[in-house]
Amino acid sequence: MSKTIAINAGSSSLKWQLYLMPEEKVLAKGLIERIGLKDSISTVKFDGRTEKQVLDITDHTQAVKILLDDLMRFNIIASFDEITGVGHRVVAGGEYFKDSALVDEEVIQKVEELSLLAPLHNPANAAGIRAFKELLPDITSVVVFDTSFHTTMPEKAYRYPLPTKYYKENKVRKYGAHGTSHEYVAHEAAKLLGKPLEELKLITCHIGNGASITAVDKGVSVDTSMGFTPLGGVMMGTRTGDIDPAIIPYLMQHTDDFKTPEDISRILNRESGLLGVSEKSSDMRDIHEAMRAGDAKAQLANDIFVDRIQKYIGQYLAVLNGADAIIFTAGIGENSVTIRKLVIEGISWFGCDIDPEKNVYGQYGNISTPEAKVRVLVIPTDEELVIARDVERFKK
């Protein structure tokens, strides 16, 4: 038996889960928030307890030290020697990483180089990797890429209709994201449906603050909504999703807001989406609360959000030539009864329908009506478990 930590490092956060492997038993989980800010918060959950402390955490290395100290302080482990592996989620692996990889300096440098493809994510991912490498240098350390699952896309799906030299020289193409989540829920869907994954056509909808839709045929990704970066695809909490590229030079010429590449990235990635349209919040719960109070901007933000998801589902029905099931996962997909209801109501023409009562109470499983030809499933994602499994694979 061994203990493995799965790590998801954000720019100011570090989410973790400690597993007993290969039993896949969760021993503890936690979240360190506001890294680099005053009043950082470390939360640890184990044995039915929740322990929280507020302190100043300057960087990811200090965050990892606190994580490890907490494991000892709460007697979750008796010695650091019990930890035999760590797996790190990395958003962008580009064309370079087609599978997970053992961490060395070359791999870390490559992750940092690929930050152009995920400027909000890869730098933080690399910081988490370096912190663990410094503090636990001898354990099996593995990077698991969001993009790996999508390397099966055919060229017609991942190429953009730009001059070929930009693909050859600059690697401009669709890479996608959320691959570990899409892969996990596809496998779980096959179990729920009682059929081999290789016989199924699935549309997986990872809908959280970041959101992406994937067409899965016979267990492999054949198309996905996120593109060259996680900015593409459906509308998100603070990201635009797909827009006409000509909008950018137009606004550069006619406003003072779009003067530098940093301005463009900030507005499209951090100030748009639900937040930009509603002018209120990037959180769907806040949007729905405002809608109930009659807020027209919140209503419009919700309507655009639903519309873009419906359009991608329709697109992938064409790509797959039909579907056996649509799967909702991630924060909004798993928890928003309203979004699931609205999305499916607008596309019921092809044979999917949800049972209202199952939708309200269904946090896992089939929420379809008995006569529905296309099943609608709710499956909580577990990206951390996928990461832990990959670490075990590299230990062997």
Swiss-Prot record:
It is found in: Cytoplasm. The record marks 178, 239 as: Transition state stabilizer. The active site is at residue 146. Substrate binds at residue 89. GO terms for biological process: acetate metabolic process; acetyl-CoA biosynthetic process. Its EC number is 2.7.2.1. It is an enzyme of class 2 (transferase). ATP binds at residues 15, 206-210, 283-285, 331-335. Its main location: cytoplasm. It catalyses: acetate + ATP = acetyl phosphate + ADP. Mg(2+). Can also accept Mn(2+). GO terms for molecular function: acetate kinase activity; ATP binding; magnesium ion binding. GO terms for cellular component: cytoplasm. Mg(2+) binds at residues 8, 383. It comes from the Bacteria. Its cofactor is Mg(2+); Mn(2+). Pathway: Metabolic intermediate biosynthesis; acetyl-CoA biosynthesis; acetyl-CoA from acetate: step 1/2. Keywords: ATP-binding, Cytoplasm, Kinase, Magnesium, Metal-binding, Nucleotide-binding, Transferase. Belongs to the acetokinase family. Catalyzes the formation of acetyl phosphate from acetate and ATP. Can also catalyze the reverse reaction. PANTHER family: ACETATE KINASE (PTHR21060), ACETATE KINASE-RELATED (PTHR21060:SF15). Homodimer. This is Acetate kinase.
